[in-house]
Amino acid sequence: MVLLTMIARVADGLPLAASMQEDEQSGRDLQQYQSQAKQLFRKLNEQSPTRCTLEAGAMAFHYIIEKGVCYLVLCEAAFPKKLAFAYLEDLQSEFDEQHGKKVPTVSRPYSFIEFDTYIQKTKKLYIDSRARRNLGSINTELQDVQRIMVANIEEVLQRGEALSALDSKANNLSSLSKKYRQDAKYLNMRSTYAKLAAVAVFFIMLIVYVRFWWL
């Protein structure tokens, strides 16, 4: 289920639009998650990963950054990640068309609060079970969800570390992993060549032995 949607300007973390669903039955305090989202916006910068999932216990934040604007959604952790990012891409496309040119000029929080109407309509589309099945069958080219950076929201906020630093660490780990695979491949090739050389030496010695003793 989609519980909270927020849109903010990356340059200064200014909230541009939002839509929150009160969930009285389960007693969830979405104000806490909204506060975490605002803290997250203030940590974003131009070097932050453009696609990210932040785990928050039974919930998960997903966000995308396009043209200096961050689109963030809070979902139950079990909500399909692919649908969450498809939902964000849908919002991004419409918001950019309606308000994209005005984003750099506004100074008042929630200047585009009227965009909530579109958010609510789109959210219903992605929550409806039949619509979700149809959307799930579409071969979208949004991104490979397996490659999206995943972190923990509490660690990110408490550590006081910019998401760009986390992204840098993720890239370093990826580089180290790639180097390890290359080194392993090189060692395997050397081992194979050594075995072939040993076999060649054996046959050469055998030929020399036969020629020397039998001819």
UniProtKB/Swiss-Prot annotation:
Q: What does this protein do?
A: SNARE involved in targeting and fusion of ER-derived transport vesicles with the Golgi complex as well as Golgi-derived retrograde transport vesicles with the ER.
Q: What is the lineage of its organism?
A: Eukaryota, Metazoa, Chordata, Craniata, Vertebrata
Q: What family classification does the UniProt entry report for this protein? A: Belongs to the synaptobrevin family.
Gene Ontology MF terms: SNAP receptor activity
Subcellular location, record wording:
Endoplasmic reticulum membrane; Endoplasmic reticulum-Golgi intermediate compartment membrane; Golgi apparatus, cis-Golgi network membrane; Golgi apparatus, trans-Golgi network membrane
**Per the UniProt entry, what species is this protein from, by scientific name?**
Gallus gallus (Chicken)
Cytoplasmic membrane side = 1-194
- Which coarse location class describes where this protein primarily resides? endoplasmic reticulum
Report what the protein is called.
Answer: Vesicle-trafficking protein SEC22b
Residue ranges constituting the v-SNARE coiled-coil homology domain according to the UniProt record: 134-194
Q: How does it sit in the membrane?
A: Single-pass type IV membrane protein
Gene Ontology biological process terms from the UniProt entry: endoplasmic reticulum to Golgi vesicle-mediated transport; negative regulation of autophagosome assembly; positive regulation of protein catabolic process; protein transport; retrograde vesicle-mediated transport, Golgi to endoplasmic reticulum; vesicle fusion with Golgi apparatus
Oligomeric form and interacting partners: Component of 2 distinct SNARE complexes.
| Recorded GO CC terms | endoplasmic reticulum membrane; endoplasmic reticulum-Golgi intermediate compartment membrane; ER to Golgi transport vesicle membrane; Golgi membrane; melanosome; SNARE complex
Please name the PANTHER family in this protein's record: VESICLE-TRAFFICKING PROTEIN SEC22B
Question: Which of UniProt's keywords are assigned here?
Answer: Coiled coil, Endoplasmic reticulum, ER-Golgi transport, Golgi apparatus, Membrane, Protein transport, Transmembrane, Transmembrane helix, Transport
What InterPro entries does the database record attribute to this sequence?
Longin-like_dom_sf, Longin_dom, Sec22, Synaptobrevin-like, V_SNARE_CC
The lineage's top-level taxon is Eukaryota
Give the gene that encodes this protein.
SEC22B
Q: Which residues cross the membrane?
A: 195-215
Q: Where is the Longin domain?
A: 6-119
